[in-house]
Amino acid sequence: MPKQKTHRASAKRFKRTGSGGLKRFRAFTSHRFHGKTKKQRRHLRKAGLVSSGDFKRIKAMVTGL
């Protein structure tokens, strides 16, 4: 049986946290900031954690995490 390949796009987008979770960056941060409030822009700068429902799928795609 061949080894499972890592999904490279996912490997670049997610990092493992110290407690075992997956850190992700937020969407809607590339342009059109004039339509967003200052509070929205500030919260979009912070990284988020992957939800438990998505965790299993992403972990299967990224074998090295």
From Swiss-Prot:
It comes from the Bacteria. PROSITE patterns: RIBOSOMAL_L35. GO terms for molecular function: structural constituent of ribosome. The keyword Thylakoid does not apply. Keywords: Ribonucleoprotein, Ribosomal protein. One of its GO terms (cellular component) is cytosolic large ribosomal subunit. Residues 1-20 are annotated as: Disordered. Residues 1-16 have a biased composition (Basic residues). GO terms for biological process: translation. PANTHER family: 54S RIBOSOMAL PROTEIN BL35M, LARGE RIBOSOMAL SUBUNIT PROTEIN BL35M. Belongs to the bacterial ribosomal protein bL35 family. NCBIfam families: rpmI_bact. This is Large ribosomal subunit protein bL35.
